[in-house]
């Protein structure tokens, strides 16, 4: 949603200023620590860590063990100071406010040495009345308290009962009692990220002065009238009216492409007032709806709303308006004891394909527009249509949601509560209410947001006994839970936004949870709602490992990032899987060993005598393992779309954990810190393809399903091929008769006992051959070429090291890699080191002598740079 505020100055009458003045206080500030031993300039928006780094007082916080070495920063109390002059007489204004869009987090704000307010919530806007205090020359001070010390103090004062958890596991090197502070929860440490509890003015800060009124919030929501079959637009504008007299005027709504030019008379009385405008769109006007990526266009309409008020005051708001409906469908299913759980967009059931979003950096001032676009473009480039903004991070910046609107990425928006119980004392709840009210107002105009969710895993934490809470206090914890998420957050959301569903938690049993008093004994019931699923010990190639659930909003496996990413934050002594650095960077208990165990199920572990080579091979194999595991699991969910087996199934969402990284470390991500694609992300591009053949075995029978997310039916054929590991010559193939693949369906296309299939392919055994398959029509490929391994690759017979070469050429801004191989090669990995960009495909099975792959650079590069940086690896290279 593009939103601009134009403050149009009107002439002053009788010495009385009627305009609204906004004075930015962004830019250069000064900061000092508690005892004044450190004094330095700091940029606003920004944080203390970034200021220290920019002045070279500290090194890169992500380098090696610096997250431990720089813990002192978060334990100190920092003060931000800015001296500024005003070039007009502020006494002529009825109201002057000092506005902070975001303060991180606990602080006392002073103007000219006089306290004007306190802050305790990173997620809300603060506006302080300084009308009678502001001078020609002013000094603002923001005196921060250490968030770590504050959280501990709040916990110590909560003596009535324990509010768990106290501290993160020691392996995370984190801080304690994060649930007692309204701050980015993962800033105290998580199992994929460091602990950097920041302090600073992390969003815009300004002075606003006005005499009549000021427009604080501008919101709009399209509403479809099913009975009349017409679109309406509800526009809400929240004003602070300081004039003692009635303020009259007009509100003019213009949407030229929809032939809308509507004038409304409005009246504003003293106080906080909301103007509601309703625009009815003529039925004869064709309104193009907003669709998720892969299902249609993201059509938006330019709208201008102008307020012309008494005294010549004029406000103008410009925004992009999108029209779409969303419905969460929970209804009985034939042959199943539960309810469905899926989303309809514009009346069409949509399978949500995507991932989970975490903060892109511990230091939000480093998250640039280019970084956001790169990461979100990578989402749609991998055929995803949805992201879940996870509840332990932040409500993302405006540009994030604007890009999601533009790209067609549906957002499951958590409120920022995660993996903990929370206090419900009065001042905490007051702060939360302000937070939720602000965020709903700020975000509800975005079509990309399709649902609100109250928290991440807190229902499960409470009802499944994660924190060994005493049974005698269960009633108290349940009461607190309902108070926070139902009586407050849910109530505020439903009052402020009736256009999208609200879910209490994730995972949850949806309507069943509601019926059971907002908490279910088992929030992971596969017959209801959404589930989170993790299992690192079972064989991930076995599809029976995975839950046949209605909707899976978290699942995944870890891997390490590439060597080129790690190299930037490590030294030579760190380049071993057993190094102190490797252990320090891993924040999941037993995470490194569990990756090796999963690898060993199907691959040989690297055994090179060269330590660096062995380390690089291990990094590669963790990515192979992760990609193959998540592929198997995701394909299981996609093919379960139309199935009910033993009452289970009708899966309509697969959001793996996680999309992006917050730093350079092992995690569940498919995008490394900086945006480089892991092998998993290339796999996601294939397993989330709109049209996909999925192969698996059940009782020695090979089944191939066709899965379609296409909006219409298509005629096609399935080709099944069998290759031997020892030769690039095709052994045998089958071609089905033409069939019609219906839109939005998953159906069996092929089934054959594996012994029968191999019998028709001379010399083939499970160990010596591999199956591939694809969908096509008239010789045109319609789907990715998928494959099915008939045995673990550690038992593959005839698999040789392949000599793979590349000839690189340039076509415009794209580079062409013409590959040649001497042998069949699984998991072919093309790498150009630190040159930013992505390939058209990667991590693939190469069964033919030649293949062409394209490289799309994100920054200017050259053929010679690519040739110098290029390296190719396939599985046999690690033996």
UniProtKB/Swiss-Prot annotation:
Pathway: Glycan metabolism; N-glycan degradation. The active site is at 457 (proton donor), 554 (nucleophile). One of its GO terms (molecular function) is beta-mannosidase activity. It comes from the Eukaryota. Its EC number is 3.2.1.25. Substrate binds at residues 190-192, 456. One of its GO terms (cellular component) is lysosome. It is found in: Lysosome. Residues 1-17 form the signal peptide. Monomer. Exoglycosidase that cleaves the single beta-linked mannose residue from the non-reducing end of all N-linked glycoprotein oligosaccharides. This is Beta-mannosidase. The lineage of its organism: Eukaryota, Metazoa, Chordata, Craniata, Vertebrata. The gene is MANBA.
């Amino acid at each position: 949603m593009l939103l601009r505020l134009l403050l149009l100055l009107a002439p002053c009458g009788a010495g009385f200023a009627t305009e609204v003045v906004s004075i930015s206080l962004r830019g250069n500030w000064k900061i000092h620590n508690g005892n004044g031993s450190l004094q330095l300039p700091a940029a606003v928006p920004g944080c203390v860590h970034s200021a220290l780094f920019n002045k070279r007082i500290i090194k890169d916080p992500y380098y090696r063990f610096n997250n431990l070495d720089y813990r002192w920063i978060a334990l100190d109390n920092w003060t931000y100071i800015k001296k500024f002059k005003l070039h007009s007489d502020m006494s002529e204004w009825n109201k002057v406010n000092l506005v902070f869009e975001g303060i991180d987090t606990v602080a006392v704000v002073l103007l000219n040495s006089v306290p004007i307010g306190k802050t305790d919530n990173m997620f809300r806007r603060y506006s302080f009345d300084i009308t009678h205090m502001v001078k020609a020359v002013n000094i603002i001070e923001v005196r921060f308290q250490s968030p770590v010390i504050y959280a501990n103090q709040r916990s110590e004062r909560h003596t009535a009962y324990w509010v768990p958890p106290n501290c993160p596991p020691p392996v995370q090197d984190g801080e304690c009692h994060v649930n007692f502070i309204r701050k980015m929860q993962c800033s105290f440490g998580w199992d994929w990220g460091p602990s950097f509890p920041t302090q600073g003015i992390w969003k815009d800060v300004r002075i606003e002065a006005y005499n009549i009124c000021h427009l604080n919030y501008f919101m709009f929501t399209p509403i479809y009238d099913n009975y009349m079959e017409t679109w309406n637009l509800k526009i809400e504008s929240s004003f602070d009216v300081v004039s003692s007299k009635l303020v009259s005027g007009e509100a003019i709504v213009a949407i030229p492409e929809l032939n809308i030019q509507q004038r409304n008379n409005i009246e504003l009385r003293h106080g906080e007032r909301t103007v509601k405008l309703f625009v009815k769109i003529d039925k004869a006007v064709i309104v193009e709806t907003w669709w998720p990526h892969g299902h249609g266009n993201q059509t938006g309409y330019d709208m201008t709303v102008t307020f012309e008020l008494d005294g010549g005051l004029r406000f103008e708001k410009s925004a992009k308006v999108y029209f779409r409906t969303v419905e969460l469908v929970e209804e009985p299913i034939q042959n199943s004891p539960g309810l469905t759980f899926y989303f309809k967009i514009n009346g069409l059931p949509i399978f949500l394909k995507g991932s989970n979003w975490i903060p892109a950096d511990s230091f939000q001032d480093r998250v640039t527009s280019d970084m956001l676009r790169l990461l979100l473009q990578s989402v749609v480039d991998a055929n995803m249509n949805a992201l879940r903004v996870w509840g332990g991070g932040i409500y993302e910046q405006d540009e994030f949601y604007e890009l999601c609107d533009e790209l067609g990425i549906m957002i499951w928006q958590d409120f920022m509560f995660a993996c903990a119980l929370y206090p419900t004392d009065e001042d905490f709840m007051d702060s939360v209410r302000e937070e939720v009210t602000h965020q709903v107002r700020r975000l509800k105009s975005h079509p990309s947001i399709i649902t609100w969710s109250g928290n991440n895993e807190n229902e499960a934490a409470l009802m499944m006994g994660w924190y060994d809470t005493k049974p005698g206090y269960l009633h108290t914890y349940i009461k607190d839970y309902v108070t926070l998420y139902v009586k407050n957050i849910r109530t505020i959301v439903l009052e402020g936004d009736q256009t999208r569903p609200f879910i209490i938690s994730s995972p949850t049993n949806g309507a069943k949870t509601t019926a059971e008093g907002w908490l279910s004994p088992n929030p992971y019931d596969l017959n209801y709602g959404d589930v989170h699923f993790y299992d690192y010990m079972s064989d991930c190639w076995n599809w029976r490992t995975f839950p046949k659930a209605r909707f899976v909003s978290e699942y995944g496996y870890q891997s390490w990032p590439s060597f080129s990413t790690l190299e930037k934050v490590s030294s030579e002594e760190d380049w071993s899987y057993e190094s102190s650095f490797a252990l320090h960077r891993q924040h999941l208990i037993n995470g490194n060993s569990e990756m090796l165990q999963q690898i060993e199920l199907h691959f040989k572990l690297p055994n090179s005598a060269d330590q660096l080579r062995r380390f690089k091979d291990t990094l590669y194999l963790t990515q192979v393992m992760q990609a193959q595991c998540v592929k198997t699991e995701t394909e299981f969910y996609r093919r379960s779309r139309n199935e009910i087996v033993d009452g289970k199934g009708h899966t309509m969402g697969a959001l793996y954990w996680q999309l992006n990284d917050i730093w350079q470390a092992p995690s569940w991500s498919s995008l490394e810190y900086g945006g480089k694609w892991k092998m998993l992300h290339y796999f996601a591009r294939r397993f989330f393809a709109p049209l996909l053949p999925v192969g698996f075995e059940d009782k020695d029978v090979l089944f191939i399903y066709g899965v379609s997310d296409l909006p219409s039916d298509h005629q096609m054929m399935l080709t099944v091929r069998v290759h031997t590991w020892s030769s690039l010559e095709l052994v045998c193939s089958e071609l089905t008769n033409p069939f019609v693949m219906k839109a939005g369906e998953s159906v069996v296309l092929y089934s054959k006992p594996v012994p029968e299939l191999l019998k028709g392919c001379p010399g083939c055994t499970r160990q010596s051959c591999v199956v591939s398959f694809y969908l096509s029509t008239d010789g045109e490929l319609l789907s990715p070429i998928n494959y099915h391994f008939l045995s673990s690759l550690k038992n593959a017979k005839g698999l040789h090291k392949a000599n793979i070469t590349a000839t690189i050429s340039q076509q415009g801004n794209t580079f062409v890699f013409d590959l040649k191989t001497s042998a069949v090669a699984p998991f072919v990995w093309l790498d150009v080191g630190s040159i930013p960009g992505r390939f058209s495909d990667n991590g693939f099975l190469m069964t033919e002598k030649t293949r062409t792959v394209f490289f799309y650079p994100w920054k200017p590069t050259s053929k010679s740079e690519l040739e110098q940086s290029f390296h190719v690896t396939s599985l046999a290279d690690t033996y």
